[in-house]
C-alpha cells in the first residue's frame, strides 16, 4: 500500500483542494487524515469534500476533532494550553457542522495501523498513541519519544499536531510528521507526505492570497480569523512555532519529566 498523509487541515478548503490535486497525480492507494481536520474557517465544506472521497480516506482523530464534537454537544472543556483554541472558536465551528459531521468526528480512532510498501507496519496518530494533544517535536528528548510510543509495536510512527514536517529516528523508531495542510509554519504552501516505498515530505504551493481572502469571506466573524488568514498569507517562522510548542510541551510534562 502507498498512502498520502494529510494532517492539520484546520478547515482550510482551498489548501486541501490544492493538495488533493497533487495527491491524485501521485496515484496513491489511500489518504490518511492524521487529525485536526475540520475546525477553522470552512468546517462543514471541508468535511463534505473529504467525504466525497469515500473509502479511499482513512480517518484519525486529532485533539481539535474531539474538541469540535464536544463543542457540538455543549461539553467542551478548554485545555488551558496557550496553543489550543478557546471555547468561542469551537462554538463558532460547531454551529457550522451537522449532526452527521459531529458523529463522524466523535467516532474517529486515536490510532490506526497500516502495512505500507517498503516500510512495513506504520502507526498513525495525531499527538501520540496515548494522547491526541501531546506534543512530539523534532528536538524532543529521546526519553520522551520512548515513553510516548512505548505501547506501539510498529517501527514507524506518523504524527501531526505541531504543523512542522520532520523525519527522525529516535530510540530505534522512525517518527514522521507530514506538517500541516492548512496552517503551516516556516514556509508558504501546504505540507503533506507520501509513504511507500519510502517517505517523501511534500509541499504544495497554491495562491495563498486568494485562499486567505476566501477564508476571510467565509468566516468574517470567526474568532482568530485574522491570525488564521494572516498565517496563510505569510506563515509564522518555524523558530517561533517551535518555541511556542516547546513551552506547551513543558507545561504538559509531569514535574521532573523529560520535557522539563
Language model features with spans:
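Core catalytic region of metal-dependent phosphoesterases/phosphodiesterases
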Residues: 2-102, 106
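Active-site environment of divalent metal-dependent phosphoester hydrolases
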Residues: 10-15, 39-42, 64-69, 132, ...
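Glycine-rich phosphate-binding loop signature in dinucleotide/nucleotide-binding domains
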Residues: 23-27, 53, 116-118, 151-153, ...
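Anionic-ligand binding region
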Residues: 139-176
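Acidic, His/Gly-rich catalytic cores of divalent-metal-dependent hydrolytic chemistry
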Residues: 169-260
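Hydrophobic/aromatic beta-strand patches that form the interior of the parallel beta-sheet core
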Residues: 32, 58-60, 158, 174-176, ...
Amino acid at each position: 500500500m502507498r498512502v498520502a498523509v494529510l494532517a492539520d487541515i484546520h478547515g482550510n478548503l482551498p489548501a486541501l483542494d490544492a493538495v488533493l490535486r497533487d495527491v491524485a497525480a501521485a496515484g496513491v492507494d489511500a489518504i490518511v487524515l492524521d487529525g485536526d481536520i475540520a475546525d477553522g474557517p470552512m468546517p462543514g465544506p471541508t468535511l463534505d469534500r473529504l467525504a466525497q472521497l469515500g473509502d479511499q480516506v482513512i480517518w484519525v482523530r486529532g485533539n481539535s476533532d474531539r474538541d469540535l464534537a464536544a463543542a457540538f454537544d455543549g461539553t467542551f472543556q478548554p485545555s488551558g494550553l496557550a496553543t489550543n483554541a478557546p471555547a468561542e472558536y469551537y462554538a463558532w465551528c460547531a454551529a457550522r457542522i451537522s449532526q452527521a459531521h459531529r458523529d463522524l468526528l466523535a467516532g474517529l480512532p486515536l490510532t490506526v495501523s497500516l502495512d505500507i510498501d517498503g516500510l512495513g507496519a506504520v502507526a498513525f496518530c495525531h499527538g501520540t498513541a496515548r494522547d491526541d494533544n501531546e506534543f512530539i517535536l523534532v528536538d524532543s528528548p529521546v526519553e520522551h519519544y520512548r515513553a510516548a510510543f512505548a505501547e506501539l509495536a510498529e517501527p514507524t510512527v506518523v504524527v501531526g499536531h505541531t504543523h512542522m514536517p520532520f523525519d527522525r529516528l529516535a530510540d530505534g523508531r522512525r517518527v514522521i510528521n507530514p506538517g500541516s495542510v492548512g496552517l503551516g509554519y516556516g514556509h508558504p504552501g501546504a505540507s503533506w507526505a507520501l509513504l511507500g516505498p519510502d517517505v517523501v515530505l511534500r509541499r504544495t504551493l497554491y495562491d495563498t492570497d486568494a485562499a486567505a481572502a476566501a477564508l476571510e469571506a467565509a468566516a468574517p466573524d470567526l474568532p482568530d480569523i485574522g491570525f488564521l488568514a494572516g498565517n496563510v498569507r505569510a506563515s509564522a517562522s518555524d523558530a517561533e512555532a517551535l518555541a511556542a510548542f516547546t513551552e506547551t510541551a513543558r507545561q504538559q510534562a509531569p514535574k521532573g519529566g523529560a520535557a522539563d
